[in-house]
C-alpha cells in the first residue's frame, strides 16, 4: 500500500494478509448494489439497458421493473450476463471465523424501498444469531448503491432490534454517478418508445449527481456510527465491459479517475481508506476471479492474476474492524 501522507492519496495496489487475524466480535452484513440479489445482472451497455426496459414494457412490468429475481418464467434476461454477487467472499470470511449475513433487496427499487427491505431482513436475521447481549450490533459492508440504502436506514429507520456500529462503503456513488446522468438524459429524450408511463425506474434518477446533492443534505451521518469508504479506479482495455461507461463518466466528470461507473471523489464518505488500483466497479466483489479464465480463453490470451487479492481485501477490512473493537 502506498501512502503519500494524505488520506486522499492512498493507493492500494496490494493487500498484506494480517499476521494475526482476529474476526470482528459482531456480525458482518453484506449489502449489494443496483440489480444485486444473489446474482448480479451486469448491464454492460446502454443497448442492453434499452432492450431490458423495452421487454419490461412488453411484459407489462414497468411498475415492478425487475424487482423479483425469483421470476425466471421467461427469457427476458438472456441478453445479460448473470454472475453470483460477493463471489466466494462470504464462505472465505466464515472460514476465518466471521459471522456473515448476506442480504437481498429489490434490485431496481428506490433507495427508500431497498432500505426498508434491508431493515426487514436484518430484523429477522439477528433473531437467528446467538448472543449474550439482548440487542445485536452489526457492521455493514456495502457495494455501490447498497451504501446509500445503508445510509438511509441508519438515518431514517429508528425502530430496530439491532444497532449499527459501522458502515464501510465500496464504490458507492455518494455524490452521484455521471453514468446515471447519462442514462436519465438518454431516456428522457428517447422518443422511439413513446409510452405515457415513466419507464425508467426511480433508482436511476436517485443515482444522478443532482439528486445526490439533495440526498446528502437530508441524510446526515449518525454520530453513533463509524463511516469508512473505499474507491476504485482503472483505465479499461477496449474489450472491458466498462470501456464505454468509463469514457462517459471520465468525460462528464472532466477527467476524474473512476471505476467505470463511480468516480473516486464520489466514493469518498466518512474516513476514506484508499483507492484500489486497476479495479473496475465489479472487480471489488470478486467477479473477475470467476470469469477471468473464460474471458481469457475467448480472446486467446494468458490469464493475468489480479494485483489486489479481493478476498484478502475483505479480510483486511474485517481485521481493521476487529482492531477498532467492532
From Swiss-Prot:
Q: InterPro entries, from UniProt?
A: AB_hydrolase_fold
State the EC number(s): 3.1.1.3
On pH dependence, the entry says: Optimum pH is 8.0.
Keywords in UniProt for this one?
Answer: Hydrolase, Lipid degradation, Lipid metabolism, Mitochondrion
The reaction(s) this protein catalyses:
a triacylglycerol + H2O = a diacylglycerol + a fatty acid + H(+); 1,2,3-tri-(9Z-octadecenoyl)-glycerol + H2O = di-(9Z)-octadecenoylglycerol + (9Z)-octadecenoate + H(+); 1,2,3-tributanoylglycerol + H2O = dibutanoylglycerol + butanoate + H(+); 1,2,3-trioctanoylglycerol + H2O = dioctanoylglycerol + octanoate + H(+)
Per the record, the domain of life is Eukaryota
The protein's location, in the record's own words, is: Mitochondrion; Mitochondrion intermembrane space
Principal cellular location given in the protein's record: mitochondrion
Where's the motif (A/G)XSXG lipase motif?
142-146
According to its UniProt entry, the function of this protein is described as: Mitochondrial triacylglycerol (TAG) lipase with activity toward long-chain diacylglycerols (DAGs) and triacylglycerols (TAGs). Involved in mitochondrial lipid metabolism.
Query: Subunit notes for this chain?
Result: Interacts with MIA40; forms mixed disulfide intermediates with MIA40.
The name of this protein is Triacylglycerol lipase 2
Question: What organism, scientifically named, is this protein from?
Answer: Saccharomyces cerevisiae (strain ATCC 204508 / S288c)
Q: Its gene?
A: TGL2
